[in-house]
Amino acid sequence: MNKKRLIGYLFVTMSVGCIQAQEQKSSVPEYKLWYDCPAQVWTEALPLGNGRLGAMVYGTPGTEQIQLNEETIWAGRPNNNANPNALEYIPKVRELVFAGKYLEAQTLATEKVMAKTNSGMPYQSFGDLRIAFPGHTRYSDYYRDLSLDSARAIVRYEVDGVQYQRETITSFTDQVVMVRLTANRPGQITFNAQLTSPHQDVMIHSEEGNCVTLSGVSSLHEGLKGKVEFQGRLTARNQGGKIACTDGVLSVEGADEATIYVSIATNFNNYLDITGNQTERAKSYLSEALVRPFAEAKKNHVEFYRRYLTRVSLDLGEDQYKNVTTDKRVENFKDTHDAHLVATYFQFGRYLLICSSQPGGQPANLQGIWNDKLFPSWDSKYTCNINLEMNYWPSEVTNLSDLNEPLFRLIKEVSESGKETAKIMYGANGWVLHHNTDIWRITGALDKAPSGMWPSGGAWLCRHLWERYLYTGDTEFLRSVYPILKESGLFFDEIMVKEPVHNWLVVCPSNSPENVHSGSDGKATTAAGCTMDNQLIFDLWTAIISASRILDTDKEFAAHLEQRLKEMAPMQVGHWGQLQEWMFDWDDPNDVHRHVSHLSLIHISEPTR
């Protein structure tokens, strides 16, 4: 599902490779996205984030819209979704696969193996901050940008000879959204601000101290009632003029300058516990942010962000098109070969990971941290048959290793919930993750069999744990995650079977993610011994064997896996001269499927077989 990717992220490592951190030069190129008109749709807005909060800034002069996210606002509540019928029917599906009845096998898997309770919960928008500026519908000299050097969004324009500026940050250090409003003449800042939300039954109140609150709860989805309670709080600090708060609208009139603050919090503690107090958390974030002036808050925010950004620099030459808007540079790229745009793209990829994955928080999901819908495409979940992994490919090679912490915690948590699923669905020890999970760390097979009958998500995620060790040599880290690696390897050791044609050890049933094969006349994905499965398990077992030697533990298990590796299907070259995607030579040279899953080991590991 390559369309579901973290915006602008996918080619960072493929295009650039391993970049060594270096000292900043005295003359450092400026990295920014800039435009000469406001955003018309959500995908044109500029993304800000601090790992926990996301903001999409439209930059419209008359009525600013800043769409807001908080990383733990998801539909539903704690649950797992393993289907107990799977234990009986997976062997029957396997028999059909081995008999060459692939479509029948896939149909049976959809009916009897896939989750019946739910297919995972959607990540949901909080809502919007809307700021109306009377008289600002006619303007000139418009400019907006996203500074990748400082994680700030700037909007500038002129109305009736007055120059206005908005500066927005999602503060890493204060954990609130701040919008700074200034003009080049005194007394010109007048606005009405409010919080809105697409959620049903939200409650909006005006409180003492010129504060607006918006409270709500996440959505019901697939029969699972939403239980994530959230609250947003809106206030402002003005110099000069008047401030008032009535009927959920915060108004400032005739100020010299003003700063708008938004805090958001939920009751989410972890995937099993939602007993937190969202009101007290939102109050605390806001009150602590109001202690310091905006200039100090911005300084702290920028310094925090740049500690990540400046670990790596990429200079591909002079910026020859700095006076051309970013959208035009992208449009012209095929003719201009704009090297500085490539460098900007590289830093934009790093920027997005910094802004959507901070230690202590949730990992970057299908849309990072940015989503304007209650029910987004593919639920904006954690799709584990390439998308979640792909978000983090740049982390080690671009010197953002510590931003893996949310991913590593997710892996630990799905290894816990996945033990239950392994027992219920497969009668196996160890742990399993299929092709998707969410904030509740569901691990059952979901959606329909063409995508969902794939038990190798855990094996792929384990590669990220091993990768951390390979980059750092940190044996204590390896010791802490070794049980996760081992238990995943144990699961595959128990569920893999010998297929009847070659007597090879294979995963069955499974699929080469989402791609149909000619063994079913292009009607089914379900198969046995898919090359990607073979590669992932080879990689996992090899890592476990190496880790056992490094840690001087589990020698018998390592020796057992070494023997099992010899029984696995090898990589095979088909009659087109291609690396086969499946155990049989089913590849079609006209296949234009967006996945090339059987090449995964070439990218993520060392294809030594």
Model features per residue range: what roles?
Residues 1-24:
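Bacterial Sec-dependent N-terminal signal peptides
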Residues 487-490, 511-513:
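Acidic helix/loop microenvironments that form the catalytic cleft of cell-wall polysaccharide enzymes
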Residues 22-450, 456, 465-469, 475, ...:
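Aromatic-residue-lined binding/catalytic grooves and analogous aromatic/hydrophobic interfacial grooves
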Residues 607-609:
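Short "domain-exit" segments at the C-terminal end of structured domains
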Residues 481-484, 490-493:
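Aromatic-lined substrate-binding rim segments of carbohydrate-active enzymes
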Residues 508-540:
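C-terminal, helix-dominated tail/subdomain
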